[in-house]
Amino acid sequence: GGPGSGKSYVAQELFGIPKKVNVSVSGLKSVNSDTEFEFLLKKFGFETFGTGRLDIDQWPDEVFDAIAGGDEDSEQMTVRKKAKLMTKDRKERYMEGRLGMIIDGTGHDYAKLSKEKKQLEALGYDCSMIFVNTSLKVALQRNSERARRLPKDILMKSWKDVQSNMGKFQGLFGSKFVVVDNSKFLKPEDAQKKFGMITRKYISKFVKTPVKNHIGKKWIKHNLLLRGKK
């Protein structure tokens, strides 16, 4: 989903991820570079004094580019790049152990996500996508209310890119593609009811279903034999 869609909130509700913890009740590991990024920004003193907010939308363009710009492939070592590299390292360690993961990202880059899906499937993973959808109006409102606000133009471009990719994602994931509408501001009890239904219908079924990927099946069988189990 796009920025301001409430992806992390929905992930917490659907998968049962306690706050300040990156593991779900079913053992899935949460992977989100924003966690490392916000940690580093606060560590290096980029909070707006006395507010606890990270008002990066108010930074001059050159400051934003020098600190929050770039990704793991960019030449300049920005705080964002360092966060991406930290997240990449953690994710690769999860992949080495074939641990289940919840990869929390925007999905604005279809080619990158499609490549990542192929890499995971080549290791034996079964993949599913939950697309968290919101209107642009709601995304802008949520962005203005959160501690780390994105510049409006960046949010709008990312939101539009994600929306244009929705049909492609549906084709890529097929029956393993689920859309969650998170446009409404729900009361806690209503949110629990809504997300509880989605969890029971889709999430629990996916998590509890044995691995179908033939590469994954072989990996599991091989490792059970190494441990002396049949």
Regions found by a protein language model. Give the residues of each.
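Glycine-rich phosphate-binding loop of ATP-dependent small-molecule kinases
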Residues: 1-230
